[in-house]
């Protein structure tokens, strides 16, 4: 039996969805498989790459991908989780199909302001919030699968 697939979606697939994908695959990749995509794929946020490297996860070689391309591939997902902020919720893409949809609002790292160090600190806070939510999801989901 194949592992249940999880798709994390945000606007650009440059930060939040990438972090969530990396954490899920790291924490419970033996039971679940995560991917991520965005409405308008961009380039990875270098500050996100930096803060993820701090916790031992290297995103530097990751590519961004479009939700539409994932949809066209015909893959089926058990869960589709949007990670856009509440302010962006209207522009956060939806993924059709027989999936369970969840919304985990997180602030957009590309919109944080301040000095480089202040931005890094704010992105670390977002990273930790995403990590906590993924850990909770993995614990709940893996219990249901066993």
Please name every model-derived segment.
Residues 38, 42, 70, 85, ...:
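Residue-level signal for alpha-helical context at structural boundaries
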Residues 88-146:
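Phosphate-binding/catalytic loops
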